[in-house]
């Protein structure tokens, strides 16, 4: 993950602190208040410190998503007070939307109605923070898919390179606030065109991949299952099966 939101899920699906070190909910279930950790920083793609992560970054991030009509906006558009009206142009002032930076470390959301699952939405990209100064400096080049330097990073990994139809490479952020719990130094995702279903498995067998998608319909599935039965992770039917080394 290159950009962290307020909360994240642990391996059991429980919500745990990320950029928010603590949070509270009003008795009526309409107001969620999060305290931003003071040791959270923004970094460039080269790992240089850019700025502290502040509550206002979450306001900027949501406004950016709304102004750009993000495809994921539907997740929160009718949840946050005033957001739907802003997106539809019924109000022009974003300060009327139910998101407020009370100070540098405190961000507050006001909902239209109680949502017991609201915290799950804070893990979504549409709720991610954006540094306003950096956003303005990049203009239309902000978050340009092929350019690692077009975004800032507050997460455990930095995007190092992205080559269309080839690979995407990440490196551990050495300054990440929780770096001691990040145990992988580099990640490389290799492109696969979906044609030869045996290709990912073969790459796993020869050590090129540490994880590969496994297709039960592939010609080599039975052989692979026998050889790597302890490495196969099965998921739900609407998900994917992987070999993990």
Question: What is the meaning of each model-derived region?
Answer:
Residues 1, 19-20, 44-49, 118-129, ...:
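A structural "hinge/loop" feature
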Residues 1-27, 152:
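N-terminal lobe/hinge region of extracytoplasmic solute-binding protein
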Residues 21-74, 108, 203:
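Aromatic- and charge-enriched surface segment that lines or borders ligand/interaction sites
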Residues 35, 56-57, 64-134:
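Surface-exposed binding/hinge segments that line
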Residues 92-95, 105, 110-182, 186:
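Gly/Pro-rich hinge or "lid" segments in bacterial periplasmic/extracellular proteins
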Residues 142-148, 174-223:
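Ligand-site clamp/hinge motif
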Residues 171-175, 193, 240-245:
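A bilobed periplasmic-binding-protein/Venus flytrap-type ligand-binding module shared by bacterial periplasmic
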Residues 213-245:
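Local pocket/hinge segments that shape ligand/substrate recognition
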């Amino acid at each position: 993950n290159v950009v962290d939101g307020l909360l994240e899920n642990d391996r059991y699906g429980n919500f745990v602190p990320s950029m928010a070190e603590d949070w509270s909910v009003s008795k009526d279930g309409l107001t969620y208040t999060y305290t931003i950790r003071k040791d959270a920083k923004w970094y460039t793609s080269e790992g240089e410190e850019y700025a502290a992560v502040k509550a206002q970054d979450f306001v900027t991030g949501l406004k950016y998503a709304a102004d750009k009509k993000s495809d994921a906006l539907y997740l929160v558009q009718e949840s946050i007070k005033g957001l739907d009206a802003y997106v539809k142009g019924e109000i022009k002032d974003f300060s009327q939307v139910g998101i407020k930076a009370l100070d540098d470390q405190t961000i507050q959301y006001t909902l239209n109605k109680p949502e017991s699952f609201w915290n799950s939405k804070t893990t979504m990209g549409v709720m991610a923070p954006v540094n306003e100064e950096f956003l303005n400096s990049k203009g239309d080049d902000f978050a340009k898919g092929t350019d690692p330097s077009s975004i800032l990073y507050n997460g455990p990994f930095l995007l190092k390179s992205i080559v269309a139809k080839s690979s995407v490479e990440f490196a551990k952020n050495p300054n990440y606030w929780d770096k001691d719990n990040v145990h992988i130094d580099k990640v490389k995702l290799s492109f696969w065109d979906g044609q030869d279903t045996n290709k990912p498995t073969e790459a796993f067998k020869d050590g090129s991949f540490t994880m590969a998608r496994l297709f039960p319909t592939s010609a080599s599935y039975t052989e692979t299952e026998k050889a790597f039965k302890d490495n196969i992770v099965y998921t739900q039917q609407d998900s994917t099966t992987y070999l993990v080394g």
